[in-house]
Structure formats: structure tokens, C-alpha cells
Amino acid sequence: MKEYQPQKIESKWQKRWQDEISYETEVDHNKDKYYVLEMFPYPSGKLHMGHMRVYSIGDVLARFQRMRGYNVLHPMGWDAFGLPAENAAIENQDLPSRWTYANIDNMKDQLQALGTSYDWKREVSTCSPDYYKWTQWMFLQLYKNGLAYKKKAPVNWCPECETVLANEQVENGACWRCDSMVEQKQLSQWFFKITEYADRLDQDLELLEEWPDRVKTMQKNWIGKSQGTEIDFPVKGSREKIRAFTTRPDTIFGATYMVLAPEHPMTEQLVQGTDQEKEVMDFIKGVHEMGKEAREAEDLEKEGVFTGRWAINPLNGEEIPILVGNYVLMEYGTGAIMAVPAHDQRDFQFAHKYNLPIKEVVTPPEGEGKTESETHDELKKAYTDHGILINSPGYNGMTSEQAIEQITRDIENKGIGAGVTTYRLRDWLVSRQRYWGAPIPVLYCDQCGILPVPEDELPVQLPEDVDFSQGSRNVLAARQDFVETSCPQCGGSAQRETDTMDTFVCSSWYFLRYTTPWDNEVPFRQEDVNYWMPVDQYIGGIEHAVLHLLYARFFTKVMYDQGYTNFKEPFSRLLAQGMVNKDGAKMSKSKGNVVSPDEILRTYGADTGRLFILFAAPPEKDLDWNDEGVEGCYRFLQRLYRLVNDNQNLVDLQLDDTKFTKEDKEYHRLIHKTIKKVTDDISERHNFNTAISAIMELTNASSKYKEQKEVNESLLRTGLETIVMLLAPFTPHIAEELWETLGYQDSVHKLNWPSYDEKAMVAEEAEMVVQVNGKVRDHLTVPADSSEETIKEKALEREKVQKYISGAEIKKVIVIPQKLVNIVCK
């Protein structure tokens, strides 16, 4: 008996696909297109199970849509810049490029071993000068249109390494490499003005009907559109004013103190030369050491310090203390809040901690007419809903909605503030004081100032022979041959920018480059990009729900506005796949629960690995790795392999359903029902697990059918061929092998996807459950087209049913055609 040998079969078909360039994309703009794209990986050197899952999902869709006749674009590339390569270079005294390209080679071999159908002719690598030339071109387009600018911003600075650290490189306030305490330092940095697009990025989420709601909600929250009012509070004894932002101007009479963010420009000014200066500056230093993430945490212990200064409430003239607090961030609003502890829970907790006044100015609607504030002891928590105003001269008795409108109007008329729309979103800081990134294409000339590098001089290339012996200091700044250049405007000496770009910039447009990756004259050809885009199906982890997807949407809108493309959104449909867990926890080396794709391929083969990972859970849910489940998938493929090999010589005649026996009809019906289910599950719902389950059921039914005395060989052949075609997107190697076993020369992946016949799915008979008062008492087989009256009669005649209804009063008989009869009696 011929045994299933997956490794032998898989290497055979992978070689053939490679030799025949089977998956090169057809350039035919007249065909209907389907662009399926998985988020490209960082070339760490090894695929993990999360990779295997996402690339298996994408490959199923690519193979399925090819068989349905679409012109499919299914490319792959490498998000290849970033810190790990630079760190490896420092540790191993190697070049980041050599480390990166070695990893790419290894991961490419692994991807091909999975049986993926990528068009490798379109492969891109973001660290290649051919690619980052166009990343730099993108920067210049933003710069020309006022969307790239430079300003000072705080960074994490390691005084020992003399370099800027990313947030993730700061561990408990110390440098991850040398353990020195990290300082906050103001550096001049490049930003992209993504805030110019905040409203469109927010509004256009409505266009993304086939994105998961949770992803859209995460983006909406990150953009953080908020309607509110900015109000100027004069500083007592000064001509200065502090502008505060609030979404609840109706509570202004309840403001009992102000809180500034430690980064607020007035903080130092307020305490300079005062008794409070040292205490406040020490507090600010401590807050900076916490890091931004800790300050944004829900369970943050809210702390503050008094500046010794007072602000004046512009509507009632009350003096309120000005504090600096760790829970106020410069990124939100104006970096200053009017604190209303009676109506904001954070302010309430802070006021209790520092014994600050609490004054109620809004009461629930049913409390209308109440005029006296509750005491500290009476108010157990802040009342944060809208209500009726009290203790607010000139506004008492108004609803919150009325007061918000009126107070904002009055503030505007007095010239002490305005109604505003604000966003949580801040401009995108793209400068990185690192070597392994795309150089920012800017020059500095003493005579001419800041100048963009001329487009015909792109790319500004990274020097290859760099020295990392000094650790993580800015390598580019130390290279005079890189820094020193001439000014394109005056011809004098100039210096290059030594910062490189955030790696998110490279991944914000790669999906456009895939449409024309070999063209060195343009980043993409308009006729190609407008044909292929937007991506029909984008697939990637939920961890990219905000930043990557938001930046990609931003770049797409910029390209649209500048006339380079004709689409406003990059991804029509998004699938955020779940994690792969083992023993109830995410796979990780530290937990010792990692299963390597290489290990699965060696033991069971790629088809088994793919089948299990697609069968074990719906793609958007977390998947729990299960060795028994993998074994089960392997045994299924073994059974199928034997079934087809044992029946490879079946006759292939035209089917004549007029001669079908009852068993033939049932088997024929199941074939067509399976085609419909698998088609719908893949295309509409992406329920690969239920599609595979249906194929397994048809396989089991085929095994049973062939054991009958009278077998219609042509029908059995049809069933086996259908199974092989339906499995082809999931398990591409064994499908090719079995198709060849059945006597065909062409690739199974070049076939048309099987179609189903609605008529063939209609059963001649229906087996129905018969209930009496909701309890199952019998089963009934009737012709499928029986009328309700006929079904009622037959059900009531049943001997088993008579036993329960004899002598009873029948109230009604409920019939659900072809499924159920329920007799209700008393």
C-alpha cells in the first residue's frame, strides 16, 4: 500500500511551482482583481507560529480566489529596518545589513517550505536603497506640502551611551543596555503633521464597513475627537494666562484648583526663583522617569505638588491654587485642566488626597431646585453625568446642555476663550537617532537654512562600512564623509541630517510599491496602483490596530490629495487574526511553551501544520495549540491519501442522475452541499474551521459510500475530485499529488473552483422531529414537498405520538417545514 510521505511530496511540488514560476502575477487590467496581503514581517531570522497562522490564512484566500478566476496579487516582503539589527551589530561587531539579509534568506526558505503562493518577483525589502529611495521621496512630498516639519521635543536620553532611547528601551527608568538613569532631553526632531488629517481619519472610519468594529473603535479612541471649550485663567500677580481645555464648561463654577502637566511651558516659569522651585522641579524629574505609559495607566496613583501660585476663575473671580500633576499630559487638550472634583472622578480622588475643596454645581435632574452644595462627607464620588446647574450664578436651573452652549458663547463674547474641536492624536515624531533606518533627505546650509535633498539625488544612501565599536552612539553623525556635502542652492558647504526615519514610515506605503516594485523611475505606476488598490483583504495582528493602520491610512490620503492615486483608503477588508497559545498562554521562550514551525514541518509536513492551524479555531479567535489535534489532522490526510490511491482508477463517465439510487442521491446531494458551504465559509465568513469540517464529513461519507454493494464509480470519482479541489487552498501539496494520482496533468490550483447545483441540494425526503408539548416523542420521514396539512396528519397518526395525545385536547400543531412538528395539547 502506498504510504503518505509529506516531506517527499511537498519538496516535489514546491520545486515544480518554483521551476514553472506558477505564482507570478498576471498583468491584465481587464480582469477582475483580488489583492490579498498579509502584514510583512520583520526579518528576525525564524518564523514562529503566529507567522505560520497569518500566512496560511492569506494563502488560502489567494489560492481560492485564483481558482475563482480572479487576477490575484499576493506579494511578500520584509519590514527590514529597526533596532534588533543594530543591536545585533553592536553585540557581534557585524554589519546590520549582513545580519538582516541572512535572516531574510532563512525566512524566505521557511515561507516557501510552508507552500505559500507568493509572487517573489515583487519581493521588497525596506532596507534596500531601491526601496528607501522612495521612502525618502515620500518624505519630500510631505515636506513640500507643509506636512513635515522640525521642532523641539522631549526624548529619552542615556547620558552614558550618549544616545536617544525608544520607550521600550527604558526599563524602570534606566537604560536597558548600561543601567544608567535615563534623562528627559529636548532635541530638535522631525514630525509629520498627521493632525491635519485627524478629522478625515476619524470620519472615514465610517467607510470601512468590512473592518472589525473593535479595530475601528481603537482607532477612533486614539484619534480622540472631542468637542469642548478652551478658557483663559489669569495668573494672580502676573499678566500671564493659562488656557485650559474642558469638555464640560457647564462645571466651571465648580473649579476649585488647576493642574498643569509637568511639560507645560508655564510650569518652570511659575516657580522660577520661588520657595517652591526645588520641590516642583524634583517632582517633575520624578514624573519624567516614570515614562508616558505608566502615567496613562488606569491604576496610576495620582500625585501633585503646589506651585505656590494662584489662578483666577474668569467667570466668578475666585482664586484657585495651581498644581502640577502626574496625571495631566501635555498631549491632551492644552496640558492644563480646570479641576472640578465634584464632577470628575480623577479630580475627586486627587482633591481628597490633598484636601482640596469640592463644590457641587450640577445635580441630577430629579434633584432640581437643590441650591446648597453637599459637604465632603456627603459626596461619596463624583457625579459625572449631565444634569441641572446649581451654585452657578446666571446659569442656575439650566440643563448641562443649555449651559455648555451658553457659557461657551459668553466666554467667546468676552474674548477669554472659544469652543474648539480637539484631538488626542498628536503629530507623528519620525526622527530616530539611529543608523539602521532610512536617512532623512534633508540638508543644513549656513547660508540657505534647511533644504530638501533634490529628488534626482535620491537615495541618500547609508554608508555600509560602519563602526559599532563605540556601542549605540549615533554612527551616522560620526561619519564625516556622510555628513559633509554641498548645498544644492548656493554650492557652499552643507551637512546632512543624521537622523533616520521611524520604521513605521517604511511600512506606511509598502502595499503601494508591490504594484510596481521593479520601476526605478517612480514609486508606483498610476495605472498599476489604481488597478490593484485598495487591498481587498489585509491580514495582521490586533497589535497593529492603531499605529501601523493609522499611518498607512494617513499616507494613502496624502497620496490621494496630491493626485498620485484615485482611492482614499488602503484596505477594504481587514482580518485581525488571534494569537497562537499553548497550555493556555501565549507561546514564548520564557514560558517554555514554544512550538516551532520547522518542528511541525519535519514531523508532519506543511499541509498538516496548515490544516490544523486553520481548523483549530476561527481566524479572528485565539488558537490553543494541541498536539492531539495536529495528530488528528495528520491522520485525516493519511486516510484521504489512501482513499484516493485505492480508488484512482474509477471510471469517469457522464453522470446520469435519473439512474441514481437513494444512496447515490444522498451522496450527490452532500457533494453539492459541501461545495456551497466551503465556498460561503471561505469567501463570506472566513470560517476556515467549519469549511474544513465539511470537507472531512464529505471524506467520511465517501469512505462509507464506496463500501456499498452497488457503487456508481463516476459519482465516487466526482466526490473524490471535489474533495481534492476543495482542499487545494488549505493543503496545496497533497491536493496536487492526489490530483495527479487521479490521472490529471494540469495543476489543481489552475482549475476553476467547483460550482454547486441548487437543485441537487434539494432533498426528496425530510426527516422531521415530532414533539408533544416540546418533548421529542418520535421521528417522521415525509416527502420534502409535503404540505403542512399532510405533515400534521401524518404526525398525529403516529403510534408513539398517539400514546401521549390520546384523550387530550389539542390546542395547536406547529410545523417547521422539513425540521419539526410540535403538538401542543392539554
Swiss-Prot record:
<feature type="short sequence motif" description="'KMSKS' region">
    <location>
        <begin position="586"/>
        <end position="590"/>
    </location>
</feature>
<dbReference type="GO" id="GO:0005829">
    <property type="term" value="C:cytosol"/>
</dbReference>
<protein>
    <recommendedName>
        <fullName>Leucine--tRNA ligase</fullName>
        <ecNumber>6.1.1.4</ecNumber>
    </recommendedName>
</protein>
<keyword id="KW-0648">Protein biosynthesis</keyword>
<dbReference type="InterPro" id="IPR009080">
    <property type="entry name" value="tRNAsynth_Ia_anticodon-bd"/>
</dbReference>
<dbReference type="GO" id="GO:0004823">
    <property type="term" value="F:leucine-tRNA ligase activity"/>
</dbReference>
<dbReference type="Pfam" id="PF00133">
    <property type="entry name" value="tRNA-synt_1"/>
</dbReference>
<dbReference type="InterPro" id="IPR002300">
    <property type="entry name" value="aa-tRNA-synth_Ia"/>
</dbReference>
<dbReference type="InterPro" id="IPR001412">
    <property type="entry name" value="aa-tRNA-synth_I_CS"/>
</dbReference>
<keyword id="KW-0547">Nucleotide-binding</keyword>
<feature type="binding site">
    <location>
        <position position="589"/>
    </location>
    <ligand>
        <name>ATP</name>
    </ligand>
</feature>
<dbReference type="InterPro" id="IPR014729">
    <property type="entry name" value="Rossmann-like_a/b/a_fold"/>
</dbReference>
<comment type="similarity">
    <text>Belongs to the class-I aminoacyl-tRNA synthetase family.</text>
</comment>
<keyword id="KW-0963">Cytoplasm</keyword>
<dbReference type="InterPro" id="IPR013155">
    <property type="entry name" value="M/V/L/I-tRNA-synth_anticd-bd"/>
</dbReference>
<dbReference type="GO" id="GO:0006429">
    <property type="term" value="P:leucyl-tRNA aminoacylation"/>
</dbReference>
<dbReference type="InterPro" id="IPR025709">
    <property type="entry name" value="Leu_tRNA-synth_edit"/>
</dbReference>
<dbReference type="GO" id="GO:0002161">
    <property type="term" value="F:aminoacyl-tRNA deacylase activity"/>
</dbReference>
<keyword id="KW-0436">Ligase</keyword>
<dbReference type="InterPro" id="IPR002302">
    <property type="entry name" value="Leu-tRNA-ligase"/>
</dbReference>
<feature type="short sequence motif" description="'HIGH' region">
    <location>
        <begin position="41"/>
        <end position="51"/>
    </location>
</feature>
<dbReference type="Pfam" id="PF09334">
    <property type="entry name" value="tRNA-synt_1g"/>
</dbReference>
<dbReference type="InterPro" id="IPR009008">
    <property type="entry name" value="Val/Leu/Ile-tRNA-synth_edit"/>
</dbReference>
<dbReference type="Pfam" id="PF13603">
    <property type="entry name" value="tRNA-synt_1_2"/>
</dbReference>
<keyword id="KW-0067">ATP-binding</keyword>
<keyword id="KW-0030">Aminoacyl-tRNA synthetase</keyword>
<dbReference type="InterPro" id="IPR015413">
    <property type="entry name" value="Methionyl/Leucyl_tRNA_Synth"/>
</dbReference>
<dbReference type="Pfam" id="PF08264">
    <property type="entry name" value="Anticodon_1"/>
</dbReference>
<dbReference type="GO" id="GO:0005524">
    <property type="term" value="F:ATP binding"/>
</dbReference>
